[in-house]
Swiss-Prot record:
Signal peptide: none annotated. During catalysis, the active site Cys acts as a nucleophile attacking the alpha-carbonyl group of tRNA-bound glutamate with the formation of a thioester intermediate between enzyme and glutamate, and the concomitant release of tRNA(Glu). The thioester intermediate is finally reduced by direct hydride transfer from NADPH, to form the product GSA. Its EC number is 1.2.1.70. NADP(+) binds at G185, A186, G187, E188, T189, I190. Belongs to the glutamyl-tRNA reductase family. It catalyses: (S)-4-amino-5-oxopentanoate + tRNA(Glu) + NADP(+) = L-glutamyl-tRNA(Glu) + NADPH + H(+). Possesses an unusual extended V-shaped dimeric structure with each monomer consisting of three distinct domains arranged along a curved 'spinal' alpha-helix. The N-terminal catalytic domain specifically recognizes the glutamate moiety of the substrate. The second domain is the NADPH-binding domain, and the third C-terminal domain is responsible for dimerization. It comes from Shewanella frigidimarina (strain NCIMB 400). InterPro entries: 4pyrrol_synth_GluRdtase, 4pyrrol_synth_GluRdtase_dimer, 4pyrrol_synth_GluRdtase_N, GluRdtase_CS, GluRdtase_dimer_dom_sf, GluRdtase_N_sf, NAD(P)-bd_dom_sf, Shikm_DH/Glu-tRNA_Rdtase. The gene is hemA. This is Glutamyl-tRNA reductase.
Length: 416
């Protein structure tokens, strides 16, 4: 086997180059077929995300795969080579396991990459570029990634502002199934917050934005209600949680507006998380008895603590991937022994069939049966021990005691 991984990622290449080597979804099927034609067993998988492009091939030469990548995208060899990494055999196996486990990600331990690797595997199956070795490699990798998630705390701590905001809400309210959330803004961060809230089964969401159309587009995906910023005073009293992230140069929520809303809520507590810079919520809101205001700085301190926790978990995860990559390579070596055993058995059976046919012919011609059987036994013995005898003789003549010992052990000569 010659398992090869060729790739570039956020650590080795700029976004400009990563864009040039990326594979669009509509071309990935044909690309994998083309790549597989450069391997001896037709096995290839392409993982292409915003942060990495990696080519996984079995029974291939890395030089051929790099040449294919250059030809496919029309890239200059000198531009690509400084950014390329190439791994083979066990190092390649461990790399894939690390990638799927989030150990090689921009955000340590992020879970999205596992889904992206799984999607690439499914696409390769659809393209017909999966066979025994690559199939087993990816299936094992998915199991390893799951083991890393369950046996370590690598995914337990929030390391993004959006995730940290929702984690704080979960910590304060314990369950989000009965809470109502007001999201202010409709940008990428708020969209990610909405996704995390939906995943955690929040009761309802309202999205307020300066342009109602942008809020409506986001609300369709998350089954939320869209409102304008001017409508916030009407919806604020119903909100248990407020999370805000706009690009407004001035605060969206003032102390007076929040104080009025709290009175209407009969002083039920309200969590407000301001992840905007400059701030969307006046700092004085935090002075109100029933308002619990947190800023982006509060979240960053949580994220820093959690990142340290993830790094500790990553050390455990590295041991898991190291161990599991060795186990996979043992399976690969066992395949090689299976092929050798099959060839040896086939060779021996061919000798047997040849000599039995000769013996039967002699018997049909009236030869003495006892003599025919003795001749068959002698010929069969000589043919079967010919190769081992030559190997023993050669090792002896060369003084190769190590090989001689292995041969004696394999032939059972050292048994008492």
């Amino acid at each position: 086997m010659s398992l090869v991984i060729i790739g570039i990622n956020h650590k080795t290449a700029t976004v400009d180059l990563r864009e040039k080597v990326a594979f669009s979804p509509d071309r990935i099927h044909d690309a994998m077929k083309s790549l597989a034609s450069r391997t001896r067993t037709g096995e290839a998988v392409i993982v292409s995300t915003c942060n990495r492009t990696e080519l996984y091939c079995n029974n291939a030469e890395k030089e051929d795969i790099i040449e294919w990548l250059e030809d496919y995208h029309g890239l200059d060899h000198n531009d690509l080579m400084p950014c390329i990494y190439a791994y083979e055999e066990q190092v390649a196996v461990k790399h894939l396991m690390r990638v799927a486990s989030g150990l090689d990600s921009l955000v340590l331990g992020e879970p999205q990459i596992l889904g992206q690797v799984k999607q690439a595997f499914v696409k390769a199956k659809e393209a017909g570029t999966i066979a025994l070795t690559i199939d087993r490699l990816f299936q094992n990798t998915f199991s390893v990634a799951k083991k890393v998630r369950t046996d370590t705390e690598i995914g337990a701590a929030a390391v993004s502002v959006a995730f940290a905001a929702v984690s704080m809400a979960k910590h304060i309210f314990s369950s989000l199934s009965t809470t109502k959330v007001l999201l202010i803004g409709a940008g990428e961060t708020i969209e990610l917050v909405a996704k995390h809230l939906k995943d955690n089964g929040v009761a309802s969401m309202v999205v307020a934005n300066r342009t109602i159309e942008r809020a409506q587009a986001m609300c369709e995906e998350f089954n939320a209600t869209a409102i304008t910023l001017e409508q916030i005073p009407d919806f604020l009293p119903k909100a248990d949680i407020v999370i805000s992230s706009t690009a407004s140069p001035l605060p969206i929520l003032g102390k007076g507006m929040v104080e009025k809303a709290l009175k209407q809520r009969r002083h039920q507590p309200m969590l407000l998380v301001d992840i905007a810079v400059p701030r969307d919520i006046e700092a004085e809101v935090g002075e109100l008895d029933d308002a619990f205001l947190y800023t982006v700085d509060d979240l960053h301190s949580i994220i820093e603590q959690n990142m340290a926790s993830r790094k500790e978990a990553a050390e455990q995860a590295e041991l898991i991937t190291e161990d599991q990559s060795h186990i996979f390579m043992e399976w690969i070596r066992s395949l090689e022994s299976v092929d050798s055993i099959r060839e040896y058995r086939s060779q021996s059976l061919a000798i047997k069939d040849e000599l039995v046919e000769r013996a039967l012919n002699k018997l049909s011609q009236g030869s003495d049966s006892e003599q025919v059987i003795l001749e068959l036994a002698n010929r069969l013995t000589n043919r079967l021990i010919h190769s081992p005898t030559q190997a023993l003789t050669s090792a002896s003549r060369q003084g190769d005691l190590n090989t001689l010992g292995q041969l004696r052990s394999a032939l059972g000569l050292d048994k008492n």
